[in-house]
């Protein structure tokens, strides 16, 4: 789900299939490995020159993409939504509800430079997303799981949090850095036999996927949960609804799922548990909200 877009954990792979058991057989000696590591370290140092911090959590991020580039892509993607998706009429109850919640969240986002807009798409899919620049899209299939206005705020504030933290730009920056490291490693390995290069690049690909890409995707989702919880509390919605929403969402999606370390998203139960731990802080924020409304209007 846009409730569904690297540090967290590492990958342990117990199989040695496809990997050399003898360093000389693979044709990779200690010097080549050290050169490769030095190349990757150099790319990492260059990347740090583009660091920024995520809002609320303060996590340091690699950011090489100008935000205006992200916003331009978001604006184009939002125009495509209007062309390609069946929208719910703007005067319908669902559209008015999504618009109202969106206005409240936008009002506490501290991004008055965004051109905030909302759309409701007629679809049974349980999905929502926010595009750079403040374009929020909600599929009406998720509304029954929301149950009430605060549940909808959980979904929408989570998606807005991805944009405020510029997770899309961070992922593009990380991919750019990984591509640069791969090029550097390929250069170091250029004089090795093809089989040695293939083995090394396969291992590199697995390491970056399971040790960098997937853990950071989960990190982004958890961070969006954290930021979103504080946003909904600022906007006047009871943050206690957040773990309840994820419990309902898990119950509504009981099909077989991949193990968490193979997934881009944390397990739903873990999300609910993590949000419970953040509730005391979020409730303090909620008590200072200008216009607290609790769970708001019932949806079902």
Residue ranges and their predicted role:
Residues 2-300:
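A Zn2+-metalloprotease active-site environment signal
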